Amino acid sequence: MQIHNKVFLVTGAASGLGAATAKGLIEAGGKVLLVDLAAAVEARAAELGANARGVVADISDEDAARRAVAAALETFGALHGLVNCAGVVGGEKVLGRNGPHGLDSFRRIVGINLIGTFNMLRLAAEAMAEGAPDAGGERGVIINTASIAAFDGQIGQAAYAASKAGVAGLTLPAARELARYGIRVMTIAPGIFETPMMAGMTEEVRESLAAGVPFPPRLGRPEEFAALARHIIENSMLNGEVIRLDGALRMAAK
């Protein structure tokens, strides 16, 4: 799929991976609806110009997600792509000093990372399926964001790893099911990236994390995630796969 003049919805777009992805799509000639729970998404969209619009929405809420998809259709007239970057992290042991892992905290992480991702996927797929196919029969592409924690989950990451493993596991069956509509589904599983989630860490901790990456020995850059998202969109043979973007990092147990 060519990006030029196509319409994309990017979640988690106020900062980090989502913001970089939205910027990259705009630079490639796309039109982007930026979605985030943070009100800053509106200012972010304004920075990107007339082909961008920001909408505040909770992706795990059915009505809010429907409004976001509707906003893309109303603003730009179609929907050709979804990049799900919205997500949260959290650390809690299955059995810690204060007792077992809280169910509310587990539900929150799974609710946003997995259910929120699926919520946007199903609603975007509905909109894409109603659109006209291109010359190759393609109607849309959906890119979800998992994490290497889906495969190398560490101690204290039970909820986060489970949520991201769910996103990874969703990829192939969704791709197979949506193939009849000409809609592709892919997932990127990033390693450790320079995002606002890392901002609270000391320089010493950041350097230690970077040293654990075989090559390049540094943290990933959001624009590198955005570049892979763009390639996935443009390469129609990429479908039903999870791509690790991690510099060959394999996380230890703790």
Name the predicted role of every residue range.
Residues 88, 99-119, 143, 167:
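Catalytic Tyr-X3-Lys loop
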Residues 126, 175-177:
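Alpha-helical segment proximal to the catalytic Tyr-Lys
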Residues 56-68, 103:
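The beta1-alpha1 cofactor-binding region of Rossmann-like NAD(H)/NADP(H)-dependent oxidoreductases
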Residues 3-33:
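Canonical Rossmann dinucleotide-binding motif of NAD(H)/NADP(H)-dependent dehydrogenases/reductases
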Residues 88-107, 126, 130-136, 156-159, ...:
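Conserved mid-core segment of classical short-chain dehydrogenase/reductases
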Residues 221-245, 250:
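C-terminal substrate-recognition "lid" of short-chain dehydrogenase/reductases
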Residues 147:
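Residue(s) in the substrate-gating loop at a strand-loop-helix junction
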